[in-house]
Amino acid sequence: VHRRIIVPGALGAASVLLAIPASAAAPSPGAPGIGDPYYPAYGNGGYDVSHYDLRLTYRPDSDRLEGTATILARTTEDLSRFNLDFLLDVGEVRVNGAKASFTTSGEHELEITPKRPLAKGTPVTVVVRYGGVPSSKEAYGFTGWHRTPDGGVAANEPEAAWWWFPSNDHPLDKATFDVSVQVPDGTQAISNGTLRSKSSRSVFDLTTGTTESGIPVVNAYSVDLGANDGAARASVERTGEVADWLSGYFGPYPYNALGGYVPNTDTGYALETQTRPFYSPRQFANGSNVSVVVHELAHQWYGDLVSVRGWKDIWINEGFARYAQWLWSEHEGEGTARELADYTYASHPADDPFWTVRPGDPGPENQFDIAVYDRGALAVHALREKVGDEDFFAILKGWPAKYAHGNASVADFRRYAEEVSGEPLAALFDTWLFRPSKPEAPAARAASLAKAADTPAQPRSWRKIAATNDVHAH
């Protein structure tokens, strides 16, 4: 376990050096949101987190979770107080060693007032002791914590942290994590990243392997998946193979751990939790589905390595993860990307509400609408036809490297694609991502469609791809 030690004497000296001069404006409360117009209360202002250390104890029988979160951050403005996003009951908060007062507000705000104001640029250590029953908590009428027969799962987007640790919960504030979970013997806890140690008897069936580049792969399956067990394993066990294949398009796999897990939960979606995607057993109710594994692993580059600047930029995540499925279909001989584009385009007449959703800015109510995925992938294919394969695949691989471990917007992607291809792309992006109407088919697709008297034949891969359409619903 990695630990970071802050020497009290050094911290005290820093506090003196950074003391607010008498002539400065009085410190003010940090904003209760990071500034995302889709979700104004998500994330918080006034500080930037670098690391979370989470020490947790969980009782599966009662769903009782107790924890101590140590948060390392630095202020970005003079603060009289600041917020964390959190739902469980808080017993104590300390800021730089001193007890702080706290209260709650809104749906998920923990307001913390330190003993003394914090000057801009101050290193801050926040310790929060807490406990509660995550499954008993709701915000905005839903929960991101899902009970299973033997425990619980925290997996949701764009929010899930509130149910198990206090945080600045928005992709703009990236941080590293150490997670330690104590559970009763016969129970296991699974999280992201590299496993440091374990001492409990297994209730998950763990399988291990490595990718061709030597990345360790750990997959976990609940022992009570029933009829879905075989199909789940036949899909998720190909994780290493799929990651190696995606590396050919997106560049080297960006992390030092890899895997997937399938708990016995009644949710219907999968989620690209970093390094170890979550899959619902229902994803495999109709047999194996490697396509959903492709989708979630594509997000390790498009969504995790490079994250959205704001949630309106969701097309960069979902359009490219869907297009990765189209490329996999081609790889498996089950339909080319063009055939899938033709079928998708022809399947939705001009008056279909599908075309009213704008993937480049869909609004929070349509953030995970099927059009963000399928029309989003059509936009990716239109880009490919516009710039040609050489530049297209250079863009596909270069983008994750350019913005690695950062955030970017749809506008950033357009500028990058123009830089690589030398083509003006504003009109294409406007047509496929922002107009609430069915675009004219590109010349290549129009010619292809003209040869077919009726709707093009459904590619063999279509049903498996469509089975991922519930991926992120609450």
Model-derived features: positions:
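N-terminal, polar/Ser/Thr-rich
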Residues: 2-8, 12-20, 24-66, 146, ...
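Extended, low-hydrophobicity, Ser/Thr/Pro/Gly-biased non-transmembrane segments
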Residues: 43, 127-200
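Surface-exposed beta-strand/loop patches in extracellular or lumenal glycoproteins
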Residues: 66-89, 165-169, 176-184, 411
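Hydrophobic helix-coil surface modules that form long, contiguous segments used
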Residues: 67, 170-294
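A surface-exposed beta-strand-loop module
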Residues: 81, 87-146
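Zinc-dependent metallopeptidase catalytic helix centered on the HExxH motif
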Residues: 233, 275-341
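Amphipathic alpha-helical substructures
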Residues: 336, 369-443
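Long, His/Glu/Asp-enriched segments that create or flank divalent metal/ion-associated functional microenvironments
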Residues: 439, 443-474
